[in-house]
Amino acid sequence: MDLLTDPRKRRWLGWGSLAVVFLLVNVHRLSTAVLSERLTTDFAISAAQLGTLHASFFVVYALVQIPTGVLADRYGPRVVGATGAVVLSAGAIAFTLSDGYLVAFLSRALVGLGSGVIFITMLRFCANWYRVDEFGTMAGLTAGIAGLGAIVATTPLAVAVSRFGWRPTVFALAVLGFLAGVAVFALARSSPADAGLDPIENVPEQPSVSLAETAGYLRELLTDREQWLLAVIFFSGMGTILTIIGLWGVPYLVVVHGLSVTAASYYTLLGSVGILIGAPTVGWVSDRIGRRLLPMVVGLGAFALTLAVIPIVGTPPLPVVALTYFLVGFSLGSVMLSLPIIKEEYPPEASGVATATVNGAGFFGAAVLPAVMGLALDRYRTGDVVAGAVVYTEFGYRVAFAITTIAVAVAFLCSLRLFVRE
């Protein structure tokens, strides 16, 4: 069968199996928004504990990025990807069996541990199977899967949870994860040579790298000024996108615009659609024009200007909010260009650890920025409680969104610095 013997076709089977796992990663990552009420009731936890439960995923996810890069370079995407799928699914099953906060917290962290290896593994797979001028497109397409997962984590997940309950629904996701892990082990070979196939023209051979060589590349990365600028871009950009779409985007609409939670979720759904469209589109454009920094600078500048509408106006018309949320998601494409930029600065055998250092910064941003926005909201809250929820103010949200706007503006300035030096 050509599908198995033609390396240009076979690579899509491997990428597709990893993509299924990555979709599940993003469903688990954003599921707490839909599950929040049930988790609060089942585990008898406060809002602060719920926030900590949510953050446990991101903290562990961020911490494993550099080790994942080392492992992906050393052992290849087949072993690391399949192991990650098994670990995150085991964590999901443990989560469904949790009878208290501590077990739930540790289970959620285990999901983050397994999930944390998948994206870097996919990038390593793409480096092994796709040409350099295809990598930006593939990185964007891979990020687009995150948008699809975010969509599944909204209304579809809510319907499933409402009909079957949250524990059976999460258990079903875990079973699917185990099956996807088997598919990864069977199909996602480390390279065409590893699959017994002819090499793909213009795809550089990815030699195995020793731990000593990896340590050398890591030391070089930690002293690389360009890497730190890209890390700031990813911290600010990815952190802002996940914070708005994954957490504060809905409460802002509920408090400031008076929408129901269900109605507000449609706006964050637009953000997820923006991710689905923007990431592969910007990656494709970057590959076609052979430029990385130009679309990054333009995209981040538009991101900052778009986001500034909320802190400046406070209560913009809902169609403007809808467009803002969509463009926030679409901007992920520009943020994602950080990864092919850093990958292309280092030898092929260092692609895993190089992309991991930048990618990890994004998920530290996803853990830090929600908390900083929360501090701003607490500073300006009224002190009233309605239906068990703390009442925040429009001014508090303006300050909170100003924080993310400043973060994105800093990312824009970092990209401009890189562009000028190009």
Q: Where would I find each of the regions flagged by the language model?
A:
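C-terminal ends and interior cores of transmembrane alpha-helices
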Residues: 86-99, 301-315
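Helix-loop-helix hairpin linking two adjacent transmembrane segments in secondary transporters
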Residues: 137, 141-195
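Conserved MFS/SLC helix-loop-helix module at the cytosolic interface between two early adjacent transmembrane helices
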Residues: 63-102
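Helix-breaking motifs and short loop linkers at transmembrane-helix boundaries and internal kinks
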Residues: 28, 44, 76, 94-103, ...
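Flexible cytoplasmic inter-helical loops of multi-pass small-molecule transporters
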Residues: 186-216, 422
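Cytoplasmic membrane-interface "Motif A"-like loop-to-helix N-cap segments
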Residues: 74-85, 287-301
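Extracytoplasmic gate region of multi-pass secondary transporters
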Residues: 32-33, 219-283, 370, 374
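Cytoplasmic helix-loop-helix junction between adjacent transmembrane helices
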Residues: 105-148
